[in-house]
Amino acid sequence: MENQNRQNAAQCPFHGSVTNQSSNRTTNKDWWPNQLNLSILHQHDRKTNPHDEEFNYAEEFQKLDYWALKEDLRKLMTESQDWWPADYGHYGPLFIRMAWHSAGTYRIGDGRGGASTGTQRFAPLNSWPDNANLDKARRLLWPIKKKYGNKISWADLFILAGNVAIESMGGKTIGFGGGRVDVWHPEEDVYWGSEKEWLASERYSGDRELENPLAAVQMGLIYVNPEGPDGKPDPKAAARDIRETFRRMGMNDEETVALIAGGHTFGKAHGAGPATHVGPEPEAAPIEAQGLGWISSYGKGKGSDTITSGIEGAWTPTPTQWDTSYFDMLFGYDWWLTKSPAGAWQWMAVDPDEKDLAPDAEDPSKKVPTMMMTTDLALRFDPEYEKIARRFHQNPEEFAEAFARAWFKLTHRDMGPKTRYLGPEVPKEDFIWQDPIPEVDYELTEAEIEEIKAKILNSGLTVSELVKTAWASASTFRNSDKRGGANGARIRLAPQKDWEVNEPERLAKVLSVYEDIQRELPKKVSIADLIVLGGSAAVEKAARDAGFDVKVPFFPGRGDATQEQTDVESFAVLEPFADGFRNYQKQEYSVPPEELLVDKAQLLGLTAPEMTVLVGGLRVLGANYRDLPHGVFTDRIGVLTNDFFVNLLDMNYEWVPTDSGIYEIRDRKTGEVRWTATRVDLIFGSNSILRSYAEFYAQDDNQEKFVRDFINAWVKVMNADRFDLVKKARESVTA
């Protein structure tokens, strides 16, 4: 009987959900591995967020005793804990590494990664090999997070702790902007690479060409391999990797040298013994480890016995003090190649002076040799890096300033415009990488708005042209790093005015009309506002023509950026290589068009229903690239109807692929070709989830619902970058 009970307990008949990824139960993904992943459009659902719905982090941050928090962080730096003692009695280097690695995942290609959501707390980042033992840094911060609670997010705390660490060791910073809002589960939309093993590097092709949009050289690394490319200790080859990786983070050579040299002025690397002594990472650790990973059995498992990267030693003889000793060591000695006690490649100074030895991490009376990584020597043996490094060596104040500016850029690059920054230490200076936009000095009444809309509709521009231009302007927005969008009207400027997807000749014609209207108005109104207002007016007209008298909400206040305020190279990465909303694709890619559509929708911050209603509406409004007929399932182009969905789902038609990759929609009885379509169009009838939305909007009783949902989604995209509206609303509440 006892055995029978034990057997019944083991079977657990009431446990009907799949709660473990390693469960032997088969999931939909197992059956259909190529199934379109729509979950990334809903990854931050309210259900995962423990805050009340009315919680506003920016409002809570305003209640923060900011200077008291900084003082608590400063004290923490030298309050060494027995469970994880501070090297040299100072946690500063550990917190700099934590902040750096939080921000350093950012890449300009798609704006994903970075510090703005605090995802270092979650898999995979919390368990990346390059983040080994940063779990200890986060645990050291917990008493402070517990004390200040909702007034400081983890994401902000990580970066502020890095700032305080630098300042507490004599380094310079130029400020801090709060406003990073925590997420509550991993970000599944970020593509970190296709490798299935840590430190694998299957992301290269040809002449070491790194796969887009990746920036790191290997799975599980933040930047580059410190031992050299694929672990080969070649400083010149390492320089090539460094340059490409930092470029993909938006950093130039000077910023790169400043960051590497400045960061390695502090602290040490840890490789006291063989890696076989190190336990599993946090996500693989046993439950009793309580989220701590990399528990080591080597010696004490901490302090001087710590194993992290496998490289062992400090870079400088003064590892808790800002100075130029990094360059003193780099250029003052020849270096010989050896292996650390953990077996990692590193370089040691030839015959170092006693004054250039570093203190032991635990015993300051004991002196130990310093070291350099292969990536450090790249700053000496790459000609361009060497010029910059020697200049910094000879000009300490310039070096300190360059590091402070590069550090601020590193830790704030993914926060978007300056209007999002919070706190008393926000720099007054505008930086070009913040994509600055002049503030507007006008307001518009409802009557004035209606008058301008009438002028636009009577200008000779079509509904299609007005909608296309507004979409082209606004849809550059990336919710990942809060860049792009309609504010600034950079669609008038290089490089956006020349992008293929924007149909430059037609765009120039539309912009010329808007400029004429602007000149005729009795008060100054930005082109940015006119573009969005024109799109809104067109949508209203299209809805009226469909029988629905509706208003499209419009909020003026956009400014017009200048070419001088626009970094052409930086903005080039925002060019869409595919935009399924316009049925545009620059060329054939290995990724199916429907996946590119979902990726675009995710970057715009759209849900699956919003993506669906926008595609259906934009097709009938004639918003396709170069007026291509694909997916325009209507005889009433320019009228906001649900025809796209009605005809997509009509079983009187069949869908037939052609050799050109386009699909023909044929009458089942006559064989007549009625319409043509792309995979982006057909996915709304093929994918069962998207089909359910298509059926919803095709219903006879949902025609008005379709119009209203389209308008809501349209306004969401038009205002996606209007952080000033959020700020004004917040200020009106707190006034």
From Swiss-Prot:
Biological process terms in GO annotation: cellular response to hydrogen peroxide; hydrogen peroxide catabolic process
**Site, as annotated: Transition state stabilizer:** 97
CDD domains in the record: catalase_peroxidase_1 (cd00649), catalase_peroxidase_2 (cd08200)
Annotated cofactor note: Binds 1 heme b (iron(II)-protoporphyrin IX) group per dimer.
The superkingdom of the source organism is Bacteria
Q: Give the InterPro entries listed for this entry.
A: Catalase_peroxidase, Haem_peroxidase, Haem_peroxidase_sf, Peroxidases_AS, Peroxidases_heam-ligand_BS
A GO molecular function held by the record: heme binding
Question: Has the keyword Iron been applied to this entry?
Answer: yes
> Looking at the record, which segments are called Disordered?
1-30
Q: Which residues form the active site?
A: 101 (proton acceptor)
Q: Where is this cross-link: Tryptophyl-tyrosyl-methioninium (Tyr-Met) (with W-100)?
A: 223-249
PROSITE patterns documented for this protein: PEROXIDASE_1, PEROXIDASE_2, PEROXIDASE_4
Catalyzed reactions: H2O2 + AH2 = A + 2 H2O; 2 H2O2 = O2 + 2 H2O
Task: State its Enzyme Commission number(s).
Answer: 1.11.1.21
Protein family membership: Belongs to the peroxidase family. Peroxidase/catalase subfamily.
What does it do? Bifunctional enzyme with both catalase and broad-spectrum peroxidase activity. Also displays NADH oxidase, INH lyase and isonicotinoyl-NAD synthase activities.
Q: What is this protein called?
A: Catalase-peroxidase
Q: Which organism is it from?
A: Geobacillus stearothermophilus
| Lineage, highest ranks first | Bacteria, Bacillati, Bacillota, Bacilli, Bacillales
Gene name of the encoded protein: katG
